[in-house]
Amino acid sequence: MGRAKRIPYGVSDFIDIIERNQYYVDKTMYIPKLEDEPDALFFIRPRRFGKSLFISMLRAYYDIKRKDKFDKLFGNLWIGSHPTENQGKYQVLFLDFSKIGGSIDQLEENFNAYCNECIDSFIETYQEYYPERVVESVLKAKTAARKLNAIGIAAEKKNLPLYLIVDEYDNFTNVVLNEQGEEVYTALTHASGFYREIFKVFKGMFSKIFMTGVSPVTLDDLTSGFNIGWHISTKPAFNQMLGFSTEDVRELFTYYKENGEIRPDSDVEAIINEMKPWYDNYCFSKSALKTQSKVFNSDMVFYYLRNYRETGEGPENMMDPNTKTDYGKMKKLLQLDKLDGDRKGVLRTIIENGEIIGNIEESFPAKLLVRPQIFISLLFYYGMLTIKGTRGEQLVLGIPNNNVRKQYYTYLLEQYDEVCAVDEMSLKSLFTDMAFDGQWKPALEFMAQAYAKVSSVRDSIEGERNLQGFFMAYLNLNSYYYTMPELELNHGYCDFFLLPDLTHYDTKHSYIIELKMLSKKDFGAMADNGRQTKAEEQWEQAVEQINRYADAPRVEALRQGTKLHKIIMQFEGYQLRKIDEID
């Protein structure tokens, strides 16, 4: 048995993966599907879904300079037995706009310098196809547009097919939009802006174009000058083109098990089931809902595999630390620090309900980002929402997994922290006592006190849904439980079930937590029955509810042998008035 393939975590160079014997999940069967589409294509996916690797594969497949390496690079892949007529046919210009940075004053200069370097490299690579005077004129030209025009005229005369591949086409424009504002952004993408002008040149000279990005915003603002693009991001044929299907993940772990790289007693199905709530559940096409399995985030799967191979178990922290960097970028792109009330309301609805009803706009200009419906679409393209179902003609868009849910809670925690900082380290220590010693009261009272501090500063937070949102955010700081809000038990929905994570910790206790709130006016008022206060009546009803939840048949399996605690917390406004465990 030969050496097992390397795990390509973070690798985006297709040739490097093949030549250095790294594991590759075959996506080459999508090549003929792409060729059936129009010649200029835009494809949007969230970060860490393998966009750069996919277009690296396309480069290797279509590049005329690599035509003779087809068998070496693709012989063991699907396309190796099903090559298309276009294999090795094109001169390929590749541009990665994430490499363009600098201050706004230097942006045009840096953009031109980067493009010049790429175009010079292009003409040097393919100089045998051009007259010497053309090569010289390209190298001497001062601007990218002039260089491209010189190549375009010469290529057309000699009938040379050109392929343009652009990675992260919207990277620096998104940064400009969010750091410099709409006016500066518009200057780049409208009228005679340099970015728009270069796209006009692209339009006239390339036989095929493939562009990727994370948002369709720039696409919309460029399209009147570049109106030949075809947006395939939500087409069912390409729903699984990036990311991994469940079968891909099964084959991946089975391969490493059979090659002795992970424990021989590894339960592949159990591994998949552990990863699913964290990395799976993406659906990018309404038409794929009932016909295709959901999609895993591929980078996260490799993160898990790498940890599993090293330690014999999944990572203690199921969130890849690199996700924190992604959150920072996403926070800027979504302008989370500048949200108005309507868009904050969208986030609140998503955080509290786990989903929202809406539709996905295929493209939209930057000036419409302030609209709540457009904001929903933006969250979808960034991978913060996914298609869960339909409601009439509208879509049910939900949080795809725990990895993304944690990012929402991070946003919520930041909002609370701006009002009144909470000592998270102390709270995490109390969670440890809660998990191993069953000492639940200090942790829950700590959160109740924090809620009161935040609410006293900002009265608008008061309300039962906001109480639940607050507790949900802080309960998710614990590492010992999966916090399950609104879990259905015996035809009702408990506020929180703390499901022990026994895969990573020997947790001894589990919890059902029910939160109840009455206004200050109602708390001491008499109930309609005339026998007790509304607070007393509410408490009685809560006891009946929580006992019914605990008697649900599935609770026995959920608590996994741990001791189950039934806790009710009752608030008068934002002040905790009663907390108790129900026997």
Question: Predicted regions: what is each one?
Answer:
Residues 98, 167-168, 202-227, 568-574:
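A short beta-strand-to-loop transition that corresponds to the Sensor-1 phosphate-sensing loop
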Residues 150-158, 184-209:
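Substrate-engagement module of ASCE P-loop NTPases
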Residues 158-188:
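Conserved P-loop NTPase "ATPase switch" module shared by AAA+ and STAND
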Residues 10, 26, 60-124:
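P-loop NTPase motor core
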Residues 554-583:
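Domain-level recognition of nuclease-like catalytic cores that cleave nucleotide substrates
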Residues 229, 294-544, 548-550, 578-583:
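Extended alpha-helical interface modules used as scaffolds for assembling large macromolecular complexes
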Residues 218-225, 232-306:
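Amphipathic alpha-helical segments of the small helical/lid subdomains adjacent to P-loop NTPase cores
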Residues 1-66, 71-79:
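Walker A/P-loop-proximal flanking segment of P-loop NTPase domains
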